[in-house]
């Protein structure tokens, strides 16, 4: 699961600036105005190839009133959700009563806390941060200037890296999506160094076709997740009970359909009391991301009345990054006019054309229209993701693909693809070996992926293709002249000179 790091501190200490620096984005609004961040922002960052989730929160002063109370509540809950906390303080303002209050709260949490003194540019850092050691939160106060990036790299590599490595395993920016933005989710040029024993163990641990299906219902707030979950459970008339899962704050609901056992991962909180405040609903983002990691199949719900939003694309990006099988459900379909339905279908083709492997269903969770057909696609996606494929089969398909369409030239030489084998399941991973295989253009990589999908009849699951260059046995060896070659030939043939 992806580790979670929360940025916490007083208003205007630079949390949003650091958030943008870590996520390499401008998702968080930044201005010299206290309280600008009201809702929590979520983004993905990476340190030494270890991804993690960053939460930007509103500031905590201790004397909040009105809407500021809600902001403070969000910040406190962010601390509970996080695996580690970056406690930001202002080196220019010095230690304040609000800092002491936040520190008192953090001491009660069983979290890894890092004190980060921001805005050290233009001042003597060591002198300015000395008083923050009195907070008693760790041995170090990390000095940074988030606006200029000073000290941020050291903060990541020295402080965060060891803990991120321990906490989790396996970016999607908001905005208009295109095929190229998600290519990394399907293709990899990293060398695969598994031994046969390691590969066999890896494949044994993968889910089998007849296993339970862990189905996570994913979507933005108010798209109908709770309604659909209730519809699914109501149709099956199962006894609903809470089964605590390994993923924090998710509820696992066992059910059965047509002889297949399912575990429905509820991220919508359908059993919460009606008087739960709206603030609590805003904390479902972390639950959703962790449910994606734990699921076999993700059912992504899109609101037909609002169309495809940036948040939909972000959730889709997390699903693809995790390699999970995918089914799309466009909800609230029955309330649209014909011209609106045509507009939504056009938008789906335009913005989500790169996930043509996913089945799309147009449903009404409220009335149950089309809900029953979702199971067929979920089952199909799971079976495709867990289908066992032999080395002989994937190599034969590779030969057929190369015969139908030769790889392009690279530096005047034809790229040769030699053989392929399975590297894992859920999602299916195919490893292709060849000379200069990593030099294949993206267009040919997509051709191979589509060829494999069609040949293996896989729908509903992404296919990841990894390329590995075959070592040249003559690389690095000295080229011999004719006389030297003749001497070696005589020696190997037992020729003796008189």
UniProtKB/Swiss-Prot annotation:
Swiss-Prot/TrEMBL keywords: GTP-binding, Nucleotide-binding, Repeat, Ribosome biogenesis
Domain KH-like span(s) in chain numbering: 387-471
SUPFAM superfamilies: P-loop containing nucleoside triphosphate hydrolases
Cross-referenced Pfam families: KH_dom-like (PF14714), MMR_HSR1 (PF01926)
Ranges of residues in domain EngA-type G: 3-167, 213-386
GO molecular function terms noted in the UniProt entry: ATP hydrolysis activity; GTP binding; ribosome binding
Positions contributing to GTP 1 binding: 9-16, 56-60, 118-121
Record flagged with keyword Nucleotide-binding: yes
Quaternary assembly: Associates with the 50S ribosomal subunit.
Entry function: GTPase that plays an essential role in the late steps of ribosome biogenesis.
Family note: Belongs to the TRAFAC class TrmE-Era-EngA-EngB-Septin-like GTPase superfamily. EngA (Der) GTPase family.
Protein name: GTPase Der
Protein species of origin: Colwellia psychrerythraea (strain 34H / ATCC BAA-681) (Vibrio psychroerythus)
């Amino acid at each position: 699961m992806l580790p979670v790091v929360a940025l916490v501190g007083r208003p205007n200490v630079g949390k949003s600036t650091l958030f943008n620096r870590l996520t390499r984005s401008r998702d968080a609004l930044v201005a010299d105005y206290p309280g600008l961040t009201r809702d929590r922002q979520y983004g993905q960052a990476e340190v030494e190839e270890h991804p993690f989730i960053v939460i930007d929160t509103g500031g905590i002063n201790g004397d909040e009133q009105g809407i500021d109370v809600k902001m403070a509540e969000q910040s406190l809950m962010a601390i509970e959700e996080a695996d580690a906390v970056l406690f930001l303080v202002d080196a220019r303002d010095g230690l304040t009563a609000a800092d002491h209050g936040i520190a008192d709260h953090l001491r009660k949490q069983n979290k890894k806390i890092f004190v980060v003194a921001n805005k050290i540019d233009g001042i003597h850092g060591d002198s300015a941060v000395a008083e923050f050691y009195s907070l008693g939160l760790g041995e170090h106060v990390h000095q940074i200037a988030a606006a200029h990036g000073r000290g941020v790299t050291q903060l990541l590599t020295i402080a965060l890296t060891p803990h991120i490595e321990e906490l989790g395993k396996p970016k999607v920016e908001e905005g208009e999506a295109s095929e190229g933005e998600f290519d990394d989710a399907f293709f990899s040029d990293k060398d695969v160094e598994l031994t046969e024993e390691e590969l066999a163990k890896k494949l044994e641990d993968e889910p089998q076709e007849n296993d339970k299906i862990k189905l996570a219902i994913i979507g933005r707030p108010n798209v109908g997740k709770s309604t659909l979950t209730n519809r699914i459970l109501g149709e099956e008339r199962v006894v609903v009970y809470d089964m605590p899962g390994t993923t924090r704050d998710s509820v696992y609901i066992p059910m059965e359909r047509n002889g297949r056992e399912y575990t429905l991962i509820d991220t919508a909180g359908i059993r919460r009391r009606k008087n739960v405040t709206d603030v609590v609903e805003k904390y479902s983002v972390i639950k959703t991301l962790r449910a994606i990691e734990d699921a076999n199949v993700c059912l992504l719900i899109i609101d037909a009345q609002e169309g495809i939003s940036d948040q939909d694309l972000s959730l889709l990006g997390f699903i693809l990054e995790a390699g999970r099988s995918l089914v799309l459900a466009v909800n609230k379909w029955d309330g649209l006019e014909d011209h609106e339905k045509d507009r939504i279908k056009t938008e789906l083709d335009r913005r989500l054309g790169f996930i043509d492997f996913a089945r799309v269903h147009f449903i009404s969770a409220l009335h149950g229209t089309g809900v029953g057909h979702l199971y067929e696609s979920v089952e199909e996606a799971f079976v495709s993701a867990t289908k066992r494929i032999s080395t002989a089969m994937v190599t034969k398909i590779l030969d057929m693909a190369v015969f139908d369409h030769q790889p392009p030239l690279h530096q005047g030489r034809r790229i040769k693809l030699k053989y392929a084998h399975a590297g894992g399941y859920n999602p299916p991973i195919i490893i292709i070996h060849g000379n200069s295989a990593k030099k294949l253009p993206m267009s040919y990589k997509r051709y191979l992926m589509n060829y494999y999908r069609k040949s293996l009849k896989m729908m509903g699951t992404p296919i990841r293709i990894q390329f590995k260059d075959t070592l040249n046995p003559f690389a690095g060896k000295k080229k011999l002249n004719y006389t030297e070659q003749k001497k070696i030939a005589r020696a190997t043939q037992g020729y003796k000179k008189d």
